[in-house]
From Swiss-Prot:
The keyword Repeat does not apply. Its main location: membrane. This is GPCR-type G protein 2. It comes from Arabidopsis thaliana (Mouse-ear cress). The gene is GTG2. Expressed in cotyledons, leaves, stems, roots, flowers and guard cells.
Length: 467
């Protein structure tokens, strides 16, 4: 019976990893890549594997609350998952990312491999030096699990705090109808006319460039036919044609520069029209019943975000440990005043399960949303390979989800923390990561507040920056 149950647990773990890997592959190809030209098989495999191991960490947190697997199976799953994820994040991804970048620049395989190895050595040295400035587990080797997890946690928690701080300000700004500007159709039509005029001018310039290039080619052909004429005529013809060709080449370069400027202007106009269309749709949506509900949720989120910012600021200034989540605290107060005949400990356990589940879902959804925004922004601005961007995002994704375990652990009841503490390392300074998160969160939130305030003010003063 025990042997059969062990096989069942192993198949369940492998099946869940395969399912998560397939979901990561689907997300990469359907939501990130879309129409991008380069789809390296190894890059897709690495992304899906990192996605599977990262989401499996959050799945294991739920398994601690809902005993789907035995304690031994969960312990093995935790250790294998952390080991594989750390090997990918600290060793494989930095090496292969550097190797691929060197290969894309035309470096030969042997030199690219040596260059990637040197980069990995420098990366490991910088990774080790980072531990000097932060509290790390004592009496442990650099390549031990607690040391590596602690260093990854610093980077990942910083990333989470920056995203959370921006989200705490941007979420109310996006949801509350107070910040939604009414857009007139005439404003959009005016920009569309400018866009059409810019595109028509760009097309006309490109036609002129082609005609000039054809004339230059014709002059070269006519020069070949002039070889049979006298030396004086050939000399005069060559001088005249060289002057004309130089003038035409200068005209071509000038028109090409104008075309680049027009294309950039067209791109900015298109983005402005797209943003205005979105703002117009948002204004129309805000007048529906769903919009009113979203507006109410926006105010509720604003209150919670202000509460979170104040509590984080209190934690940073007075160095106080974080208190209970406000939702759990309100339910505890409710149970004290109203006896509904439910065991408080049992209800607290279910609330804990629901709260952790919501944390996990919001964490995954929020990260994937920011992942898509970052990918599209980098792919639109830069000319680098999309594979390099995906490898970079794989590194960030693994660090993000691993660090989320360090923070979620504090929200668990004491009986659910045992395995997580043992696997990550009992001497990891868990409280430090919460204080570090609060400090970066406050800085990110206030900086985002200043930027969004400046953006809102400038938008009110000047409605059309590209007119």
């Amino acid at each position: 019976m025990g042997y059969g149950w062990g096989i069942f647990e192993g198949m369940l773990v492998i099946g869940s990893l395969c399912l998560l890997g397939s979901a990561g592959l689907w997300f990469l190809n359907r939501r990130l890549y879309k129409e991008y030209e380069e789809k390296r098989a190894l890059v897709q495999i690495i992304f899906s594997v990192v996605f599977a191991f990262s989401c499996n960490l959050l799945q294991l947190v739920l398994f601690e609350i809902i005993p789907v697997l035995s304690r031994e199976a969960r312990m093995v799953n935790w250790k294998v998952d952390l080991f594989c994820l750390i090997v990918l994040l600290v060793f494989m991804l930095p090496y292969y990312h550097c190797y691929l970048m060197l290969r894309n620049t035309g470096v030969r395989r042997e030199r690219a491999a040596v260059g990637a190895l040197l980069f990995l050595t420098a990366f490991l040295y910088a990774f080790w030096r980072m531990g000097i400035h932060f509290p790390m587990p004592s009496d442990k080797g650099f390549f031990s699990m607690p040391q590596l997890v602690s260093r990854i946690g610093v980077i990942g928690v910083t990333l989470m705090a920056v995203l959370s701080g921006f989200g705490a300000v941007n979420l109310p700004y996006s949801y509350i109808s107070l910040f939604i500007r009414e857009i007139e159709e005439s404003e959009i039509k005016s920009l569309e006319r400018q866009l059409m005029q810019s595109m028509e001018t760009c097309i006309a310039k490109k036609k002129k460039i082609l005609l000039c290039q054809v004339e230059v080619e014709r002059s070269l052909v006519s020069e070949e036919h002039q070889k049979g004429k006298s030396f004086f005529r050939r000399f005069v013809g060559t001088v005249v044609r060289s002057v004309q060709d130089d003038q035409k080449e200068q005209d071509i370069k000038l028109m090409e520069a104008e075309v680049e400027g027009l294309e950039e202007l067209s791109k900015q106009l298109f983005l402005e029209i797209y943003e205005l269309r979105q703002a117009k749709d948002a204004a129309a949506f805000s007048r529906t019943w769903k919009g009113h509900v979203q507006n109410f949720l926006g105010y509720a989120c604003s209150i919670y975000c202000v509460y979170k910012m104040l509590k984080s600021l209190q934690s940073v200034v007075f160095k106080e440990a974080g208190t209970k989540d406000p939702v759990t605290m309100m339910i505890s107060i409710f149970l004290q005043f109203f006896d509904i005949g439910v065991d408080a400990a049992l209800l607290s356990q279910y609330i804990s399960l629901l709260f952790i589940g919501m944390l996990i879902v919001i964490s995954v959804r929020g990260f994937l949303t920011n992942l898509m925004k970052f990918f599209f922004a980098v792919s639109r601005v830069g000319s680098g390979s999309s594979s390099n961007v995906v490898l970079f995002l794989s590194e960030i994704m693994g660090m993000y989800f691993l660090s989320s375990i360090l923070l979620i652990r504090k929200s668990l009841r004491n009986e659910y923390r045992g395995i997580i503490t043992d696997v990550l390392g009992g001497d990891i300074q868990f409280d430090f990561y919460h204080r570090w998160f609060d400090a970066i969160f406050v800085a990110s939130a206030f900086l985002s507040l200043l930027l969004l305030s400046a953006h809102y003010t400038s938008r009110q003063i000047d409605k059309h920056p590209i007119d």
